[in-house]
């Protein structure tokens, strides 16, 4: 019954494989076999059910003092639930407090297969279990994990309607918490085994979970950690109290706990509704709107959990136990930031009719058909970012949390793809997304790996939004995880534990071109700003048997552009051009295809074993399909982290190896192919190294060869069918120094000149709106042209930012200059026009050319009358008469309006009120404008006067003297006022006459000018002095 070997069968959920044989009565993967089978001890079955269940449970945590354990070993009444206190924070760190990657398992049939973590220190804890004497008693004890919700073998507290594989989640804290059940009501009257095994130093705490009946199996339950109980518990009344200074609950006795949870099991789904996750009544749209929720996690300063979330009972035995619990909890607060990174998210729904192949999932992953998200945990800031993964059943994305990732063997995928579950579990895995459209095609070997090597994990470390194939490996579990089918929904996993050995940043095997006809109907794998950071931890490449090539091949024919426009969602998030910096994570292979038209006979294959590469993503403007890979890993390496390869090679070694391989690379200029020779001959079939994807009028993609401006690099390729546009580059762009930037500036200048020369021929191919240019991402050139690639990239980015009002990037700089000059000239014209209006309230040109006859006639008549008056009378008399005339008019009009208003009894107000309200004040600005204009003329006049009178030029001074002598004769004949009258007549008559008879006047003026010139020459010829000067 209680066999010592059976005690070690489940000694550690992470260091053993739980090899409970299906033939063993209590070793089945279903905990339902535990209460039904009384001939066999239930310890192993309880442990198996604890890790192989598949539904989320309410969590309860038992915590008592260490004294209770010793009293339990010494024949204390079995009604007490004895659990161990927590170790100190230093001891827990020594035992490797982690959120175990290994705590995930798959059930094949009814046999749970659990991969072990490979921790040696856990074995030490397991060896301590064998030291205790093992006797038979009436208490049920699990040697490694306590049975969830007080479940014991003899009197089942789990309803009979439970699914075959209920889920339990056990978080190893380096301690074993033992729940000792008081009474065992086995139908056969047989007591269970190992009642007091490993109670002294083997301390653990267990997150116990409730279960769901099959009728509620499709519903999404709340997933809780740290004894987050349902908000309401039906059945018997439950007294809920917070244990002092403790986020965990203390339950007094098992009977009340069993009775309490028996009813809570039945209503766990309904009770979780308010603050957990969605129910099955919610639609996919509702789920998708709320799929970015993260449940609030308690930290050190956040206070207590809600009352409804804790099934807390006051421990009533001793005050010492409470003090012990409080002390232990205070110790636990030292590392709660890492523990609380356990996230609570829903999981993909399982088909209930395939219970024999039911997949075991941990509590953090609920089985829902709706979308879920991957929170990638930033261990430094304890922030959670969620990543929706494309659902296999073709409905909505799947999400999985960071804490414990269950590898879901999705049976729906097999049903859709029509492929049977293969027997070889470590064979090639594929991530084939089947859409809801009828034109979806089947994809084979999207991610091909050699047999025996589990699929590699795919992280998308992006500040933008990436659509990538995400494949999760279980390499750090010593490659012992068996996968159930070849169509696994495997997702990114991030270890949030404190152990540096478990902190992994895996390779990026991003395949954005995998079967776009499947991506289009699916919500693509959207990973917004998922950055995995590990504070002060080493980053290790987890071994994967053999470091083989990640091949992206067998791309089938893509669907039409219209279907892509209809189905592909906008996941770009308006990421700017060339935002993706190069990541330093090894084996970063992205094969990008144009999503519009790709020849199915020519798949793009990107293979790069054991070589770090940098990814420059293409943004497909048409479908807003982008892959942004940031430099998180590179920045971590700059901060002193150590990125380790399989053979523990440093990043420098990897770069050196890649450099050697790059030096061996052969650039075939005719075919523009880049061949990298490495351990496996890897062929990079690329297009001309610098290419830009543009969106043409037909909705497809058009490759416009910007690189053709560099004639030594590439050839012009126009059309709608792109070649492979993804070369690899060994060194990141961040390493370019100032000299390269100077070369970039030089190249930009040369390119600008060439663009002006080729503007006429290139404009036809370069028609692209500025918004589209801003959205496009340019590919890097191969290894042999890293600087030129960076130059072109920067040039394109600058062109995109400089577009502004121009839609032709070829002539953008010239257009900008023209616009600037034109705008400047317009501004000057406006200023001149303003000055002219300030100097003269009307245009003199319009006046003298009689553009407005009324205005010109009024001005001409008034000035002529005034001049005639001055000719007949003195100036004083003229001015006085003019003022009297004006006043007589205004006063008469004012009296007239007043009389009219009095007769008509109207109150129109002052007749000149509109003119009185006009602001005629001269501002300082206007005065300065007047003065500036006047000073120009005044200074010119002063300079001319000084020049003439001081005889700077004798000839000019003589000319002035002759002119003044002639004016004496004019003054003797004409008065000054007469001259002014004549001048006014000429000003208002000559321009209009000249404009009307310009041709004739110019002819006669030319004749007169020629005659005058001939006469002057004759006179100068007779003067000897002037003739000699001209001869010299």
From Swiss-Prot:
Region (Interaction with BACE1): 1000-1002
Sequence ranges of Low complexity compositional bias: 1-24, 32-61
Source organism superkingdom: Eukaryota
Residues recorded as bearing Phosphoserine in the entry: 30, 229, 243, 246, 283, 316, 453, 649-650, 735
Any GO BP: endoplasmic reticulum tubular network organization
Subcellular localization(s) per the UniProt record: Endoplasmic reticulum membrane; Golgi apparatus membrane
Identification of the protein by name: Reticulon-3
Organism: Homo sapiens
Lineage per the UniProt record: Eukaryota, Metazoa, Chordata, Craniata, Vertebrata
């Amino acid at each position: 019954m209680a066999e010592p070997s059976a005690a070690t069968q489940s000694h550690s959920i992470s260091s053993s494989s739980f090899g409970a044989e299906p033939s063993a009565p209590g070793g089945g993967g279903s905990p339902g076999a535990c209460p039904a089978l009384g001939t066999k001890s239930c310890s192993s079955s309880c442990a198996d059910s604890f890790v192989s269940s598949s539904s989320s449970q309410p969590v309860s945590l038992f915590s008592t003092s260490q004294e209770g354990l010793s009293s339990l070993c010494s024949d204390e009444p079995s009604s007490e639930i004895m659990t161990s206190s927590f170790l100190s924070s230093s001891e827990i760190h020594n035992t490797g407090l982690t959120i175990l990657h290994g705590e995930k398992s798959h059930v094949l049939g009814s046999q749970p297969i659990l991969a072990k973590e490979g921790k040696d220190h856990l074995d030490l804890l397991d060896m301590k279990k064998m030291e205790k004497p093992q006797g038979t008693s009436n208490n049920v004890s699990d040697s490694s994990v306590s049975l969830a919700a007080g479940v014991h073998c003899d009197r089942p507290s789990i309803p009979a309607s439970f699914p075959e594989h209920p889920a339990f989640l056990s978080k190893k804290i380096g301690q074993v918490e033992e729940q000792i059940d008081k009474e065992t009501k086995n139908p056969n009257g047989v007591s269970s085994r190992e009642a007091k095994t490993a109670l002294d130093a083997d301390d653990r705490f267990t997150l116990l979970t409730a279960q769901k009946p099959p009728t509620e199996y499709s519903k999404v339950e709340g997933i809780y950690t740290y004894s987050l109980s349902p908000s309401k518990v039906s059945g018997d009344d439950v007294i809920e109290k917070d244990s002092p200074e403790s986020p965990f609950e203390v339950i007094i006795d098992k009977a009340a706990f069993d009775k309490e949870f028996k009813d809570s099991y039945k209503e766990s789904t309904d009770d979780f509704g308010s603050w957990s996750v969605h129910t099955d009544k919610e639609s996919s749209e509702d789920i998708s709107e709320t799929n970015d929720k993260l449940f609030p996690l308690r930290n050190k300063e956040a206070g207590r959990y809600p009352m409804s979330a804790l099934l807390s009972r006051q421990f009533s035995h001793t005050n010492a136990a409470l003090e012990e619990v409080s002390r232990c909890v205070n110790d636990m607060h030292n590392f709660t930031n890492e523990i609380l990174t356990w996230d609570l998210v829903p999981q993909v729904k399982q088909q209930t009719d395939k219970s024999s192949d039911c997949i075991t999932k941990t509590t953090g992953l609920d089985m829902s058909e709706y979308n879920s998200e991957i929170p990638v945990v930033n261990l430094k800031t304890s922030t959670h970012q969620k990543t929706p993964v494309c659902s296999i059943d073709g409905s909505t994305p799947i999400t999985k949390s960071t804490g414990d990732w269950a590898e879901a063997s999705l049976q729906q995928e097999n049903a859709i793809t029509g492929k049977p579950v293969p027997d070889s579990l470590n064979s090639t895995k594929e991530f084939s997304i089947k859409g809801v459209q009828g034109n979806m095609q089947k994809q084979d070997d999207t991610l091909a790996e050699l047999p025996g090597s589990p699929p590699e994990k795919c992280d998308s470390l992006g500040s933008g939004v990436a659509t990538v194939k995400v494949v999760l490996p279980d390499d750090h579990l010593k490659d012992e995880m068996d996968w159930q089918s070849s169509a696994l929904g495997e997702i990114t996993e991030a270890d949030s534990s404190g152990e540096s050995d478990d902190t992994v940043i895996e390779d990026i095997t991003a395949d954005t071109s995998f079967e776009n006809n499947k991506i289009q109907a699916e919500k693509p794998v959207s990973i917004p700003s998922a950055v995995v950071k590990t504070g002060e931890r080493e980053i290790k490449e987890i071994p994967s048997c053999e470091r083989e090539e990640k091949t992206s091949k067998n791309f089938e024919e893509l669907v039409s552009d219209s279907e892509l426009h209809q189905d592909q969602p906008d996941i770009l998030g308006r990421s700017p051009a060339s935002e993706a910096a190069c990541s330093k994570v090894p084996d970063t292979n992205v094969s990008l295809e144009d999503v519009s038209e790709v020849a199915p006979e020519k798949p793009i294959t990107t293979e790069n074993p054991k070589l770090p590469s940098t990814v420059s993503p293409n943004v497909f403007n048409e479908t807003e399909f982008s892959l942004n890979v940031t430099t998180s890993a590179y920045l971590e390496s700059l901060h002193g982290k150590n990125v380790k390869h399989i053979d523990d090679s440093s990043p420098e070694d990897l770069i050196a190896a890649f450099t050697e391989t790059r030096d061996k690379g052969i650039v075939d200029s005719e075919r523009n192919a880049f061949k990298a020779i490495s351990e496996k001959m890897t062929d990079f079939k690329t297009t001309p190294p610098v290419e830009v994807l543009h969106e043409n009028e037909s909705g497809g993609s058009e490759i416009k060869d910007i690189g053709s401006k560099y004639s030594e690099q590439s050839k012009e390729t126009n059309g709608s069918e792109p070649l492979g546009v993804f070369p690899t580059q060994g060194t990141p762009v961040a390493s370019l120094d100032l000299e390269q930037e100077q070369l970039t500036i030089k190249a930009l200048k040369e390119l600008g000149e060439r663009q002006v020369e080729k503007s006429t021929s290139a404009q036809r191919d370069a028609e692209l709106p500025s918004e589209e240019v801003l959205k496009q991402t340019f590919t890097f050139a191969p290894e042999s042209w890293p600087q030129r690639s960076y130059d072109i990239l920067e040039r394109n980015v600058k062109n995109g930012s400089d577009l502004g009002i121009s839609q032709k990037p070829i002539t953008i700089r010239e257009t900008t200059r023209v616009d600037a000059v034109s705008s400047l000239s317009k501004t000057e014209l406006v200023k001149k026009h303003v000055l002219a209006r300030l100097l003269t309230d009307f245009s003199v040109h319009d006046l003298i050319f009689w553009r407005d006859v009324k205005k010109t006639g009024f001005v001409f008549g008034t000035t002529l009358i005034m001049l005639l008056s001055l000719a007949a009378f003195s100036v004083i008399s003229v001015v006085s008469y003019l003022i009297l005339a004006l006043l007589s008019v205004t006063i008469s009009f004012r009296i007239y309006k007043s009389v009219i208003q009095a007769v008509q009894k109207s109150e129109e107000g002052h007749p000149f009120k509109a003119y009185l309200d006009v602001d005629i004040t001269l501002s300082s600005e206007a005065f300065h404008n007047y003065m500036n204009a006047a000073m120009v003329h005044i200074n010119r006049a002063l300079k001319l006067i000084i020049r003439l009178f001081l005889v700077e030029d004798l000839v000019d001074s003589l000319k002035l003297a002759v002119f003044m002598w002639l004016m004496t004769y004019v003054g003797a004949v004409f008065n000054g006022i007469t001259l002014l009258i004549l001048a006014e007549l000429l000003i208002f008559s000559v321009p209009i006459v000249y404009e009307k008879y310009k041709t004739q006047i110019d002819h006669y003026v030319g004749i007169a000018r020629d005659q005058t010139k001939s006469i002057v020459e004759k006179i100068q010829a007779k003067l000897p002095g002037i003739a000699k000067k001209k001869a010299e």
